[in-house]
């Protein structure tokens, strides 16, 4: 029994050692630390106290990384302000669609919007290339305008202002400069540049020329202000002031007058508008040089004509200029007019020689000058012209010109815009001309004429083309439906004096032949003595007098027939004779309808 009790008490001595170890704190702490340091289940070597501190530190970091209520509210306010500004910008953009065009610009740089440009409404910025035309409706802020690209199908959007474009250019140059500096720090660039210095070799010249180009482009403004409607100017086939050139250009002016009735203003410009270069007008020191030179026009007169052209273009009607002094597109390349250059081209020099010789000795003696001017125009690259009319038939050339101008009209008058009122446009054009120097307006057909000297009328004032319909014994502005025999090719109802009644003696009026000319007269020498049908001969042919009386009865009928398609201008023999060669004589049909009245 004692042994059993002794055996049952056997485990007590080790159990008695456990309390001794429990009451000894230092061995217990050291052992527990070692145990916690080397025998953690996760295999880490950090102690329990450090792990607890890490847990507490992590909870503090997670607490501080959370945005505060003030930060959240500030971000919401910014988003609300952005949405409100975008809503207002869209509303202003919608209102601008019905507003008139304030002014127009031609771009000298290109622009492709990027997300970092801070457009008022993302995705509504206008992309354009150099030499594009923009209609500006209004200013949105200092960085953005509201307008549209003058192109069919383009809508109103945001256009960067010159200030914005300059800032974008400076930012781009700064980025390029930083890229160059970073690339120059590389070992290859430094060693190559050092090798150039040591060996004494010179770098090629293109970098220097590139720097010069960069300096020259820095001073070019991003936009040039131009007329809201680009004026139409005819050049060729030779020099203005000579019969062949004037007759062909006059045929086109008369076609435009009737084809675009109510949508076009045609005006005579006698001042030398080639002097209206931006470098001249903006530099007062050059004014004295121009004034002292033997120029035809003074700078004040030129400036007045330019302002009048801008005023005409504000009505958004087509504007055609009969400019006496413009014979080459380079004359207007540095002006602010940005015209639509129409080149009347005669491909064969022999055809031009034949036309000049057919006008008589007075024109034949200036043959070399006219041929030289024609060759100079032919040497110009096609990019200098907007339209090249090289058709042999007048009808085809007119339709070619009409197609281009119809497309331009659609580009400048988008469908979203309120359709123009022709009567209102005519009134606006008349009001614009009222402030111009010595204008002549025509409300029956917006054929607007101006000159420098007053007419020798009883009133002493400029008058409309239709105010004196019986002065020359013919009603101007008609296309007769029936022509007497021998007049089937007649295209003109307006004489040169009626059309440009402000001309002075000795001007381009002398180009046009007398009423006695006929189709057969094209093959005769006009320098011969006056026939019985000429005013100097003391009489008027009965057929001519009767034809104008009959034409008055057909005025209403022909107002709806403005197209020249009914009157084909072909140079053919009278009396049903054989048609001459197409290359030479169908082209001469330009002159047949012009000279015969």
Swiss-Prot record:
<keyword id="KW-0407">Ion channel</keyword>
<keyword id="KW-0109">Calcium transport</keyword>
<feature type="modified residue" description="Phosphoserine">
    <location>
        <position position="44"/>
    </location>
</feature>
<keyword id="KW-0728">SH3 domain</keyword>
<dbReference type="GO" id="GO:0016529">
    <property type="term" value="C:sarcoplasmic reticulum"/>
</dbReference>
<keyword id="KW-0472">Membrane</keyword>
<feature type="modified residue" description="Phosphoserine">
    <location>
        <position position="193"/>
    </location>
</feature>
<dbReference type="GO" id="GO:0098978">
    <property type="term" value="C:glutamatergic synapse"/>
</dbReference>
<dbReference type="InterPro" id="IPR046937">
    <property type="entry name" value="CAB1-4_N_A-dom"/>
</dbReference>
<keyword id="KW-0106">Calcium</keyword>
<dbReference type="GO" id="GO:0042802">
    <property type="term" value="F:identical protein binding"/>
</dbReference>
<dbReference type="InterPro" id="IPR008145">
    <property type="entry name" value="GK/Ca_channel_bsu"/>
</dbReference>
<feature type="compositionally biased region" description="Low complexity">
    <location>
        <begin position="43"/>
        <end position="53"/>
    </location>
</feature>
<dbReference type="InterPro" id="IPR000584">
    <property type="entry name" value="VDCC_L_bsu"/>
</dbReference>
<dbReference type="Pfam" id="PF12052">
    <property type="entry name" value="VGCC_beta4Aa_N"/>
</dbReference>
<dbReference type="GO" id="GO:0030315">
    <property type="term" value="C:T-tubule"/>
</dbReference>
<dbReference type="GO" id="GO:0019904">
    <property type="term" value="F:protein domain specific binding"/>
</dbReference>
<keyword id="KW-0813">Transport</keyword>
<keyword id="KW-1003">Cell membrane</keyword>
<feature type="modified residue" description="Phosphoserine">
    <location>
        <position position="73"/>
    </location>
</feature>
<dbReference type="GO" id="GO:0019901">
    <property type="term" value="F:protein kinase binding"/>
</dbReference>
<feature type="modified residue" description="Phosphoserine">
    <location>
        <position position="47"/>
    </location>
</feature>
<dbReference type="GO" id="GO:0051219">
    <property type="term" value="F:phosphoprotein binding"/>
</dbReference>
<feature type="region of interest" description="Disordered">
    <location>
        <begin position="1"/>
        <end position="79"/>
    </location>
</feature>
<keyword id="KW-0107">Calcium channel</keyword>
<feature type="modified residue" description="Phosphoserine">
    <location>
        <position position="547"/>
    </location>
</feature>
<dbReference type="InterPro" id="IPR001452">
    <property type="entry name" value="SH3_domain"/>
</dbReference>
<feature type="modified residue" description="Phosphoserine">
    <location>
        <position position="186"/>
    </location>
</feature>
<dbReference type="GO" id="GO:0098794">
    <property type="term" value="C:postsynapse"/>
</dbReference>
<feature type="compositionally biased region" description="Acidic residues">
    <location>
        <begin position="548"/>
        <end position="558"/>
    </location>
</feature>
<protein>
    <recommendedName>
        <fullName>Voltage-dependent L-type calcium channel subunit beta-1</fullName>
    </recommendedName>
</protein>
<dbReference type="GO" id="GO:0005891">
    <property type="term" value="C:voltage-gated calcium channel complex"/>
</dbReference>
<dbReference type="InterPro" id="IPR005443">
    <property type="entry name" value="VDCC_L_b1su"/>
</dbReference>
<dbReference type="GO" id="GO:1904646">
    <property type="term" value="P:cellular response to amyloid-beta"/>
</dbReference>
<feature type="compositionally biased region" description="Gly residues">
    <location>
        <begin position="530"/>
        <end position="540"/>
    </location>
</feature>
<dbReference type="GO" id="GO:0008331">
    <property type="term" value="F:high voltage-gated calcium channel activity"/>
</dbReference>
<comment type="function">
    <text>Regulatory subunit of L-type calcium channels. Regulates the activity of L-type calcium channels that contain CACNA1A as pore-forming subunit. Regulates the activity of L-type calcium channels that contain CACNA1C as pore-forming subunit and increases the presence of the channel complex at the cell membrane. Required for functional expression L-type calcium channels that contain CACNA1D as pore-forming subunit. Regulates the activity of L-type calcium channels that contain CACNA1B as pore-forming subunit.</text>
</comment>
<dbReference type="GO" id="GO:0005245">
    <property type="term" value="F:voltage-gated calcium channel activity"/>
</dbReference>
<feature type="domain" description="SH3">
    <location>
        <begin position="100"/>
        <end position="169"/>
    </location>
</feature>
<dbReference type="GO" id="GO:1902514">
    <property type="term" value="P:regulation of calcium ion transmembrane transport via high voltage-gated calcium channel"/>
</dbReference>
<keyword id="KW-0851">Voltage-gated channel</keyword>
<feature type="region of interest" description="Disordered">
    <location>
        <begin position="179"/>
        <end position="223"/>
    </location>
</feature>
């Amino acid at each position: 029994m004692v042994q059993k009790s002794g055996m049952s008490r056997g485990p007590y001595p080790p159990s008695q050692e456990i309390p001794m170890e429990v009451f000894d704190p230092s061995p217990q702490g050291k052992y527990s630390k070692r145990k916690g340091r080397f025998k953690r289940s996760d295999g880490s070597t950090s102690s329990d106290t450090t792990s607890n501190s890490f847990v507490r530190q992590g909870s503090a970091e997670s607490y501080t990384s959370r945005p505060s209520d003030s930060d959240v509210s500030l971000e919401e306010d910014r988003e609300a302000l952005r949405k409100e500004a975008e809503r207002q910008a869209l509303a202003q953009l919608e209102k601008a669609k019905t507003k008139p065009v304030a002014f127009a610009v031609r771009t000298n740089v290109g622009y492709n919007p990027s997300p970092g440009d801070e457009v008022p409404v993302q995705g509504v910025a206008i992309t354009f290339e150099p030499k594009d035309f923009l209609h500006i409706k209004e200013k949105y802020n200092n960085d953005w305008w509201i307008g549209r690209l003058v192109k069919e199908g383009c809508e109103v959007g945001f256009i960067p202002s010159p200030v914005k474009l300059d800032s974008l250019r400076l930012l781009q140059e700064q980025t390029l400069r930083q890229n160059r500096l970073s690339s120059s720090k590389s070992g290859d660039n430094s060693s190559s540049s050092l090798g150039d210095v040591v060996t004494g070799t010179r770098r090629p010249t293109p970098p220097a020329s590139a720097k010069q180009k960069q300096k020259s482009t820095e001073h070019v403004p991003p936009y040039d202000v131009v007329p809201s409607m680009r004026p139409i100017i005819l050049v060729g086939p030779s020099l203005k002031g000579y019969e062949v050139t004037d007759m062909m250009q006059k045929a086109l002016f008369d076609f435009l007058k009737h084809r675009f009735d109510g949508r076009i203003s045609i005006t005579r410009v006698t001042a030398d508008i080639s002097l209206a270069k931006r470098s001249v007008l903006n530099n007062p020191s050059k004014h004295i040089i121009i004034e002292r030179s033997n120029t035809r026009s003074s700078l004040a007169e030129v400036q007045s004509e330019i302002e009048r052209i801008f005023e005409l273009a504000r009505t958004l009607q087509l504007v055609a200029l009969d400019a006496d002094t413009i014979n080459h597109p380079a004359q207007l390349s540095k002006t602010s007019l940005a015209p639509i250059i129409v080149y009347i081209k005669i491909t064969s020099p022999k055809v031009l020689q034949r036309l000049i010789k057919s006008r008589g000795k007075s024109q034949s003696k200036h043959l070399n000058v006219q041929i030289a001017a024609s060759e100079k125009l032919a040497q110009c690259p096609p990019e200098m012209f907007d339209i090249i009319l090289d058709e042999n038939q007048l009808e085809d050339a007119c339709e070619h010109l009409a197609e281009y101008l119809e497309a331009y009209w659609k580009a400048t008058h988008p469908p979203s815009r309120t359709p123009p009122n022709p009567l209102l446009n005519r009134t606006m054009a008349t009001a614009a001309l009222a402030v111009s120097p010595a204008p002549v307006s025509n409300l029956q057909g917006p054929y607007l004429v101006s000159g420098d000297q007053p007419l020798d009328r009883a009133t002493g004032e400029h008058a409309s083309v239709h105010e004196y319909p019986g002065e020359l014994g013919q009603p101007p502005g008609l296309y007769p439906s029936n022509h007497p025999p021998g007049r089937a090719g007649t295209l003109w109802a307006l004489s040169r004096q009626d059309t440009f009644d402000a001309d002075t003696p000795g001007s381009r009026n002398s180009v046009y032949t007398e009423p006695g000319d006929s189709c057969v007269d094209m093959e005769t020498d006009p320098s011969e003595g006056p026939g019985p049908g000429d005013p100097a001969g003391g009489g008027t042919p009965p057929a001519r007098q009767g034809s104008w009386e009959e034409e008055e009865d057909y005025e209403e009928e022909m107002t709806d027939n403005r197209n020249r398609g009914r009157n084909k201008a072909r140079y053919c023999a009278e009396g049903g004779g054989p048609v001459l060669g197409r290359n030479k004589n169908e082209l001469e049909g330009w002159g047949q309808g012009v000279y015969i009245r």
